[in-house]
């Protein structure tokens, strides 16, 4: 008789803890499951987009333990104990009000079709969490791994820079 081994992992996603059984049995998470599939398919967080599935486009970017990561390249079982924030986790959970960076993208048309936008915003948010006043060059460099097929890179950068200026003004008051 084959003895099954099941590992239990815990993720904290958008402030909420989740446990998953990793194994080969029915209802268990396969060891090969990537974080993007766990977030989208198991947790219903469809703001995380699956683009290239090779870590090249940035559409699946989330913040894990304070750093932007491409969730299509992370095995979920390797994320045990991690704190993860998705695009859904930036908005106020009680009211649904967008955070300032998300609102800046709306106000300054930092998107076109919107498919890449969550990954771009998450990458920018991770940068701003580390450096609240980056230069435009630093913003462009941070976003260089996020691709937009519609060509809205310039409006994405403009949106981030507008948000930074807004934050500077609010700090002066």
Which residues fall in each region the model found?
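Signature of N-terminal electron-transfer/Fe-S-associated modules in redox systems
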Residues: 1-173
């Amino acid at each position: 008789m084959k003895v099954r081994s099941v590992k239990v992992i815990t993720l904290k996603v958008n402030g909420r803890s989740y446990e998953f059984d990793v194994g080969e049995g029915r209802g268990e998470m396969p060891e090969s499951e990537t974080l993007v599939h766990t977030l989208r398919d198991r947790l219903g967080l469809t703001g995380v987009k699956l683009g290239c599935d090779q870590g090249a486009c940035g559409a699946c970017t989330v913040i894990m333990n304070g750093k932007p990561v491409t969730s299509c390249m992370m095995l979920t079982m390797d994320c045990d104990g991690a704190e993860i924030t998705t695009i859904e986790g930036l908005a106020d959970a009680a009211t649904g009000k967008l955070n300032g960076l998300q609102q800046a993208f709306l106000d300054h048309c930092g998107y076109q079709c919107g498919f890449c936008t969550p990954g771009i915003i998450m990458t920018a948010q991770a940068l701003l969490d580390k450096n609240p006043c980056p230069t435009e060059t630093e913003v462009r460099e941070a976003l260089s791994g996020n691709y937009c097929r519609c060509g809205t890179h310039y409006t994405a950068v403009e949106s981030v820079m507008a948000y930074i200026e807004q934050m500077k003004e609010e700090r002066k008051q």
